[in-house]
């Protein structure tokens, strides 16, 4: 049986976008830095990264759709943080952002990865943005690198 899988080594010419929500920027800034770090550590070049900022998580799918349409990128990472509050707003934003990103990704002809945190507390978000639980932006970029390379093999 032949196995086809991606690897974590970039050639250096791959162009990527990081689409980040500005809302909860203390968290999302760390996710962006984690994604950038993973890209650079695995052979990417800083000049091949574009950061696209959208107001909040709900706007991530639209930003993703427009970025895909440009045809400029080999892959895209979406990052953001939705933190539960006292109202049902969290449930709507988290569900619709997730669904929008998933639906847009399935229509894309480039790899897209998901680094949107949906947490119950600010502490959980902080943990997932570079402290106890690693950095989910870094992890999302590793997934993107692997998928970019897998895409080339398929």
From Swiss-Prot:
Biological processes per GO annotation: riboflavin biosynthetic process
Gene name for this UniProt entry: ribH
Cited Gene3D superfamilies: Lumazine/riboflavin synthase
Biological source species: Nautilia profundicola (strain ATCC BAA-1463 / DSM 18972 / AmH)
Chain positions recorded as 5-amino-6-(D-ribitylamino)uracil binding sites: 23, 57-59, 81-83, 114
Keywords for this protein: Riboflavin biosynthesis, Transferase
Function: Catalyzes the formation of 6,7-dimethyl-8-ribityllumazine by condensation of 5-amino-6-(D-ribitylamino)uracil with 3,4-dihydroxy-2-butanone 4-phosphate. This is the penultimate step in the biosynthesis of riboflavin.
Single annotated GO MF: 6,7-dimethyl-8-ribityllumazine synthase activity
InterPro entries cross-referenced by the UniProt entry: LS, LS/RS, LS/RS_sf
UniProt cross-references to HAMAP family, sorted A to Z: Lumazine_synth
GO cellular component terms, semicolon-separated: cytosol; riboflavin synthase complex
Family membership: Belongs to the DMRL synthase family.
Residues noted as binding (2S)-2-hydroxy-3-oxobutyl phosphate in the record, renumbered to the chain: 86-87, 128
Catalytic activity, EC: 2.5.1.78
Upper lineage: Bacteria, Pseudomonadati, Campylobacterota, Epsilonproteobacteria, Nautiliales
Name the record gives this protein: 6,7-dimethyl-8-ribityllumazine synthase
Any Pfam family hit: DMRL_synthase
Active site residues per record: 89 (proton donor)
Pathway stated in the Swiss-Prot or TrEMBL entry: Cofactor biosynthesis; riboflavin biosynthesis; riboflavin from 2-hydroxy-3-oxobutyl phosphate and 5-amino-6-(D-ribitylamino)uracil: step 1/2
NCBIfam families the UniProt entry points to: lumazine-synth (TIGR00114), PRK00061.1-4 (NF000812)
Reactions it catalyzes: (2S)-2-hydroxy-3-oxobutyl phosphate + 5-amino-6-(D-ribitylamino)uracil = 6,7-dimethyl-8-(1-D-ribityl)lumazine + phosphate + 2 H2O + H(+)
